[in-house]
C-alpha cells in the first residue's frame, strides 16, 4: 500500500492544537463556517446546535451555534446539526471503509478516493438528472453531498406527507432535544422520515449504476465483506443517518479540522497519528479529488480556498420535486407502501417449519452489540425472509430483541429502538424485494469472513436459505 504521508513531518498534539488555534483565527474560515450554519453571523444561524470533539472519542458536546468561537479556541473538530430552523438538510455520506486497516484511507488517500470515483460520479449524475446540485465536501475518507429543502416549499410538504414516524419516536421528539430546550416539530420529523425514503431510492439507483464499475463492493451502510488483498474494504453510500432521530445527527462543518485518526491512536500509535494530521474538511468546488486530498492537508492551501469558495448549503427545493416524482413511480415506493401497511395492520409471527439457523438465533439472543451492526441486521432480514417472515414481522422481532435487558447502558438515550428496527428492516428487505441484493455473500464462508459466525460447527448451511430466497424471487 502506498505511503502518501511518508514524507510528512510528525506534528505533536500540542503543536497541532497550536496550529489549529492560529488557523481558526482566520476571518475567511470563520465566515465560511457561519455560511454553513445558515447565517451571516452566529446569532442568526439556522442550525439548532453545533457539536465539538477533540477526536479521541465519539463523544461530542452539543451547544448553541454562538459557542463556535469557544470551540475553535479549543482546537476542536466541529459539526453542525442536520436539524435546522428554516430547512430540511439533506446529506449523502459517501466514504471508503477498511475494517482491517482503518488508517488505509489516510495513509493512501489517492487510492481510497480513486476507488470511490465511480460511486461519486453515479451519485452526482443521478442527482443532476433531477436538477439537484449539492455542496460537495471532501472529508478524510470520502465525501458529503449536502443541500437544503426550505420548510416553506412544496417539496417539504410532499416529504412530510410521505414520512411515517412511529409513536415511540413521536414521543421522543416531543421532549427537549436541543441545547435551547427545543423539541422536534412533528412536520419536520415527518419530512425527515420522508427524506429517508428518498435517500433510500437514490441509494438503490447509485448502487445499481456503480456496482459493476466499482472495484470494491458498494454497500448502503458500513457492512463488512470478505477480505481482499488490502483487507475487508468497501465503498459505503451510508444511509444509516436516516435510521436515527433527526436531533441526533450532525455533519462536519467545512473548513473544520478533521480529527478522526485520533480515535485509532490505541491501534496504530501516537507517532502514526502525528504523521497523518492535519486534515481539514473542504468544499470540492472546481478541484479534482486528487487536488483536494493534497490541499486539505495544507493549512495555507485551505486558507486560500476559504477566501473564494462558499460553504453555504444550496437550496434545492424545486429540484427535489422531480426526485420525489421519480420515487413515487418506482418499485421501491410500492414496497414501502406495502411494508407500512403491514406495520399499521399489525402482524403475528409466522408458523415456520424451517428452523432459524444458529448464527441468526445467536444474533437475536445477543443483541448488544451485535444488532447495532448493519451486517448483522442484514443477515437477520435475509434469513427470516427466506423462511417466510414478512418484513413487518421481522421489524417486530428485531425490536423485541432491542427490548431485552442486555446491559444497553445509555444506548437508547441516544437511539430510538423501534424506528431503528423499522429502518434497517425496510432497507434490507427492500433490497431483497427489488432484486438489488444479489445475495452473493449469503453463505457460510462469507459469513465467517465477515466475522459474524459465532457457531462454526453448526449443521446449518446458509446456501439453502439463499436458494430459498432466490426461489421466492423467481416465483414473483
Over which residues does each language-model region extend?
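DNA replication initiation on ssDNA origins
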Residues: 1-112, 151-194, 211, 215-266, ...
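Short, hydrophobic/amphipathic alpha-helical patches that form generic packing surfaces
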Residues: 73, 200, 252-255, 375-387
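Secondary-structure capping and boundary motifs in well-ordered enzyme cores
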Residues: 82-88, 115, 138, 369-373
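Long, well-ordered alpha-helical scaffolding segments within enzyme catalytic domains
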Residues: 111-131, 192-206
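Long alpha-helical, hydrophobic tracts
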Residues: 124-127, 138, 151
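Short beta-strand
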Residues: 133-139, 243
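Short, conserved phosphate-binding/catalytic loop or strand-edge motifs used
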Residues: 139-147
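Basic, alpha-helical nucleic-acid-binding regions used in initiation and control of genome expression
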Residues: 189-193, 274, 279, 283-284, ...
Amino acid at each position: 500500500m502506498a505511503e502518501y504521508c511518508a514524507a510528512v513531518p510528525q506534528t505533536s498534539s500540542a503543536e497541532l492544537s497550536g496550529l489549529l488555534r492560529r488557523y481558526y483565527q482566520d476571518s475567511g474560515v470563520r465566515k465560511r463556517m457561519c455560511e454553513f450554519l445558515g447565517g451571516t453571523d452566529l446569532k442568526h444561524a439556522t442550525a439548532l446546535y453545533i457539536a465539538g470533539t477533540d477526536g479521541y472519542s465519539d463523544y461530542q458536546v452539543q451547544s448553541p451555534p454562538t459557542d463556535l468561537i469557544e470551540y475553535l479556541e479549543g482546537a476542536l473538530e466541529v459539526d453542525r446539526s442536520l436539524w435546522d430552523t428554516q430547512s430540511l438538510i439533506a446529506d449523502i455520506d459517501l466514504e471508503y471503509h477498511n475494517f482491517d486497516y482503518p488508517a488505509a484511507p489516510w495513509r493512501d488517500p489517492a487510492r481510497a478516493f480513486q476507488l470511490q470515483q465511480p460511486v461519486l460520479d453515479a451519485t452526482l449524475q443521478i442527482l443532476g438528472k433531477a436538477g439537484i446540485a449539492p455542496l460537495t465536501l471532501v472529508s478524510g475518507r470520502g465525501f458529503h453531498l449536502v443541500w437544503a429543502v426550505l420548510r416553506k416549499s412544496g417539496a417539504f410538504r410532499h416529504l412530510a406527507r410521505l414520512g411515517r414516524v412511529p409513536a415511540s419516536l413521536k414521543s421522543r421528539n416531543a421532549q427537549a432535544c436541543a441545547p435551547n430546550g427545543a423539541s422536534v416539530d412533528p412536520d419536520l420529523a415527518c419530512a425527515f422520515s420522508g427524506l429517508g425514503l428518498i435517500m433510500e431510492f437514490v441509494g438503490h439507483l447509485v448502487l445499481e449504476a456503480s456496482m459493476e464499475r466499482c472495484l470494491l463492493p458498494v454497500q448502503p451502510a458500513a457492512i463488512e465483506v470478505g477480505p481482499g488483498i488490502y483487507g475487508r474494504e468497501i465503498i459505503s453510500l451510508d444511509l444509516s443517518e436516516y435510521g436515527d432521530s433527526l436531533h441526533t445527527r450532525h455533519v462536519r462543518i467545512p473548513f473544520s479540522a478533521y480529527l478522526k485518526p485520533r480515535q485509532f491512536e490505541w491501534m496504530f500509535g501516537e507517532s502514526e497519528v502525528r504523521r497523518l494530521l492535519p486534515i481539514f474538511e473542504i468544499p470540492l468546488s472546481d478541484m479534482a479529488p486528487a487536488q483536494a486530498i493534497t490541499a486539505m492537508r495544507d493549512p495555507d492551501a485551505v486558507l486560500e480556498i476559504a477566501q473564494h469558495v462558499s460553504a453555504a448549503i444550496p437550496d434545492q427545493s424545486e429540484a427535489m420535486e422531480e426526485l420525489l416524482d421519480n420515487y413515487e413511480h418506482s418499485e421501491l415506493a410500492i414496497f414501502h407502501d406495502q411494508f407500512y401497511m403491514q406495520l399499521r395492520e399489525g402482524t403475528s409471527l409466522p408458523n415456520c417449519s424451517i428452523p432459524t439457523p444458529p448464527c441468526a438465533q445467536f444474533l437475536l439472543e445477543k443483541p448488544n452489540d451485535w444488532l447495532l451492526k448493519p451486517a448483522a441486521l442484514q443477515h437477520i432480514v435475509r434469513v427470516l425472509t427466506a423462511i417466510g417472515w414478512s418484513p413487518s414481522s421481522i421489524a417486530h422481532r428485531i425490536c423485541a430483541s432491542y427490548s431485552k435487558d442486555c446491559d444497553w447502558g445509555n444506548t437508547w438515550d441516544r437511539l430510538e429502538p423501534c424506528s431503528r428496527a423499522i429502518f434497517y428492516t425496510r432497507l434490507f428487505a427492500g433490497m431483497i424485494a427489488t432484486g438489488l441484493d444479489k445475495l452473493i455473500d449469503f453463505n457460510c464462508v462469507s459469513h465467517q469472513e465477515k466475522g459474524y459466525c459465532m457457531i462454526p460447527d453448526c449443521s446449518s448451511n446458509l446456501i439453502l436459505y439463499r436458494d430459498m430466497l432466490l426461489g421466492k424471487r423467481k416465483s414473483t
